[in-house]
Structure formats: C-alpha cells, structure tokens
Regions:
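ABC ATP-binding cassette signature C-motif
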Residues: 1-92, 146-380
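Flexible nucleotide-interacting loop at or near the entrance of a catalytic core
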Residues: 83-174
C-alpha cells in the first residue's frame, strides 16, 4: 500500500479484505480519503468502525443465515438492525398476548351454545396469527469487565528522563511525564516501536539505558503485550494457563472468566499453543480480568479481535475505574476511550489532555506534529 497512485486507473471494483490491518493511523486516514474519492465500486471487509463510517455508503449484514443490505454507514446499520430486532420482538409480544386472550375465550365458551359462533370466529382469528421467526444471531459478544481489587491513589506513575537505544536506533530520548489517577492515555503516532519499548519498560520487561520511573504504592499493573508469543509457548491447557494468574484456584471460578470470553465446554482443555490469534487475545483479556489490576498497559489490544470483541473491550475500558496507558490504530476505540493523548515523535513528546478527534483537529498541534515527526537525519 505504499504506491497507490495507479490503483484507480483501470479497476472497476476493489475487493479489500481487512485493508487497515498493520497500517498506522496516518496510513488509514490516507486510505479513507483514497476510497472516498474512488469513483468506482469498493467492497470491503473491516473491523474498524470509524473506517466503515467514513468510507461506506451501504452495509451488507451477514447474519441470521442471510444477507441484508442497508443504505448508510456502519452506525446507521447498527441502529437500524437493533431497531428492527426490537420491533420484531415487540410485535411478537403483542401477538402472544392476543393468542393468549383468544385461547382463553375459546376455552371458556367453546361448549357454550350461545357463544359458539364467537368461539369459532376466534379460532379462525387464532389460526391467522403467525409469530415472526427471530433466528438467533451468529454474533456473540464477550463480557469484558475490569474490576480492580484496590482503589488507586493520587500518586500513580512518574516517568523521568527515560532513554533507550536498540541496535543503534534511538527509540526513546529523554521521555518524561506524570500520570494522574483519572488518566486514560492513548499513545498515538507513527513511532509505534517507541511506544512498545516504553510499555515494556513500564511493565518491567526491559530496562532503560538512562532515566527512571516510579509506580505509586497503591498501584497494580496488568500488561497486554503486542507480541504475546512467549505467553503461550508452553503445553498448558487454557484452564491451567489462566489458573496460574488467579489467587482463587477453584476450576469453576476460573472457567467463569473463560466463559465471559466465549470459551465454553471442551474449549477449556485446549492447549494454549494451538490457539488462534483471536483466541490468544481473549485469553490475555481473561488474564487481566482475573488479576484485577488498577492500571492497565495495553499495546494494540484490538489486534486479531472481531467486531463484537472490539466493541465489548471498548465498552469495558470506558467503564474501567482505573488508569489506562494504551496504543491502538482503531480511531473510534481511541476516541471513545482516551481522555489524554501522548505522541512520541522523532524529536520529543507531545502531551495534551484532550480527546483524539480534538487532538487531530487542532491546527497548532498539527503543525507541531509535522515538525517534530520529521526525520532529523534526513531533514530537507
């Protein structure tokens, strides 16, 4: 996707399967504009709600064993489909009440000669009533609810002059910031390697070359790494894998957390090393729920998740009463979760108490971002 200029010349239809995967926010924004201005047909599969809202004029909903087409974007589809189900359920409820009323009349008066005609008429009316067939949805939403064991105090995290170089590349250069007890901080921008390294340092998996950091005495941390390979490089089954992170060792208790993440029945005896990418992410989220920390460090937690799981995670983080440091390339996820934005640029740190949309819309910050993200070695 680096050289797209030729794409629109001869393509009548673009078929795009998860085109935003592995793209950063700037590349996704470029792709959105390209597709909006593309004059021919685009058929796209994506789990990025903001992207679908920006690009799509129609939504094909594959559910209930059929395809239903909706005119409008993702939000319109969601509201319309939920309204349709609600209306069908309400209509069925009214029909069921009518059926009960007719059945009671027939039962009372079918043997009564003076009421027999009325009873016969109601039998005919009863035969004409048909309930709408509401098939169970193929969509399953996990239940994600992070409940800290301990309330967080005012002193959360102080990062002081941290620097880190890896294989000759300076990833972090004199990084300093303080985290408050109400902060939900999104780390954004193209320098994702720097964010990952910072999170590893704060989680105790790496050491800084210079500088230091200090967690408050009331804090407990839960870390979700971008690469979870080593977490599952063992022969444990899912239940045993999760039990090692739980103070309560009762199998029924542990299975309850797996059930929240849609693991059922024999899923619990699967070996973790054979799980899919999405299943491993759901296991990691189960781990965070069962550990119950009051500070979450989440590096690209929506990777490998389906739309329903992303929505559930999004809602769970919005409700979370603790501190969150996270990164994500999902615009809506960042916009609805974060109340503070930090960008680690090539030449320093931008830190703003704001939403992501406000951050992007700020012209002064946009100029600052452009200057600070220039490659200082190859600057024109």
């Amino acid at each position: 996707w680096c050289d797209h200029g030729h794409m629109g010349i001869c393509a009548d239809v673009l078929l795009l399967d998860e085109p935003t995967n592995h793209l950063d926010m700037d590349a996704i924004a470029w792709l959105e504009e390209f597709l909006i201005n593309f004059e021919n047909t685009v058929i796209v599969v994506s789990h990025d709600r903001y992207f679908l809202n920006k690009v799509c004029t129609q939504i094909a909903d594959i559910d209930y064993a059929k395809i239903q087409l909706y005119a409008g974007n993702y939000d319109f589809w969601y509201e319309s489909s939920q309204l349709m189900i609600k209306q069908m359920k309400e209509a069925n409820k009214k029909k069921e009440e009518k059926i009960k009323e007719l059945q009671e009349f027939i039962q009372r008066f079918s043997a009564n000669a003076s009421k027999s005609k009325q009873a016969t008429s109601r039998k005919r009316a009863l035969e004409k009533i048909e309930l709408d067939d509401i098939k169970p949805s193929s969509r399953k939403y996990p239940y994600i609810d992070f409940r800290p064991k301990r309330e967080i105090g005012n002193e959360v995290l102080t990062v002081s002059h941290i620097s880190k170089t890896v294989e000759g590349e300076k990833l972090l250069d004199d990084v300093s910031f303080t985290v408050g007890h109400d902060d939900k901080i999104a780390f954004v921008g193209p320098n994702t390697k720097a964010t990952t390294m910072l999170f590893k340092i704060l989680a105790g998996e790496e050491k800084p070359d210079e500088g230091s950091f200090k967690w408050g005495v009331t804090t407990s941390q839960g870390y979700f790494p971008k690469d979870n390979t080593k977490e599952f490089d063992n022969d444990l089954i899912i239940v045993d894998w999760l039990t090692q992170y739980s103070e309560e060792k009762d199998a029924t208790y542990v299975r309850g957390f797996l059930g929240r993440m849609l693991f059922a029945g024999d899923d619990g005896v699967k070996k973790v090393k054979v799980l899919s990418g999405g299943e491993k992410v759901r296991c990691m989220l189960s781990k965070l729920m069962i550990m119950a920390p009051n500070c979450l460090i989440l590096d690209e937690p929506t990777n490998h998740l389906d739309m329903e799981s992303i929505t559930a995670l999004n809602n769970g983080l919005i409700k979370f009463p603790g501190v969150i440091l996270f990164s994500s390339q999902d615009h809506q996820f960042v916009q609805t979760t974060a109340n503070r934005i930090i960008e680690l640029t090539n030449t320093g740190l931008i830190d703003k108490q704001t939403t992501y949309d406000e951050y992007l819309a700020n012209d002064e910050l946009a100029r600052k971002r452009q200057i600070m993200n220039m490659d200082v070695d190859g600057e024109d």
